[in-house]
């Protein structure tokens, strides 16, 4: 179920503070955040946000196609290495 339009997008307050400071200071350093649940806003375009995936911070460059999505969608949490090969079929 999607979020109600009248509520507006959710963004953590501490992330908005960091983004405003980066935009005002023309800072190019990645903004570190653990807030995977925050929605990407148009103010984020052109910034690099390092989103935590449970193990490390994954740097993500925000472009206009990402607006409206959640930050967690771009930092994958699971790594799939493939299923084990069947030893009988290799013979």
Curated annotation (Swiss-Prot):
<dbReference type="InterPro" id="IPR023575">
    <property type="entry name" value="Ribosomal_uS19_SF"/>
</dbReference>
<dbReference type="GO" id="GO:0005737">
    <property type="term" value="C:cytoplasm"/>
</dbReference>
<keyword id="KW-0689">Ribosomal protein</keyword>
<dbReference type="GO" id="GO:0019843">
    <property type="term" value="F:rRNA binding"/>
</dbReference>
<dbReference type="InterPro" id="IPR020934">
    <property type="entry name" value="Ribosomal_uS19_CS"/>
</dbReference>
<protein>
    <recommendedName>
        <fullName>Small ribosomal subunit protein uS19</fullName>
    </recommendedName>
</protein>
<keyword id="KW-0694">RNA-binding</keyword>
<dbReference type="GO" id="GO:0000028">
    <property type="term" value="P:ribosomal small subunit assembly"/>
</dbReference>
<keyword id="KW-0699">rRNA-binding</keyword>
<dbReference type="GO" id="GO:0003735">
    <property type="term" value="F:structural constituent of ribosome"/>
</dbReference>
<comment type="similarity">
    <text>Belongs to the universal ribosomal protein uS19 family.</text>
</comment>
<dbReference type="GO" id="GO:0006412">
    <property type="term" value="P:translation"/>
</dbReference>
<dbReference type="InterPro" id="IPR005732">
    <property type="entry name" value="Ribosomal_uS19_bac-type"/>
</dbReference>
<dbReference type="Pfam" id="PF00203">
    <property type="entry name" value="Ribosomal_S19"/>
</dbReference>
<dbReference type="InterPro" id="IPR002222">
    <property type="entry name" value="Ribosomal_uS19"/>
</dbReference>
<dbReference type="GO" id="GO:0015935">
    <property type="term" value="C:small ribosomal subunit"/>
</dbReference>
<comment type="function">
    <text>Protein S19 forms a complex with S13 that binds strongly to the 16S ribosomal RNA.</text>
</comment>
<keyword id="KW-0687">Ribonucleoprotein</keyword>
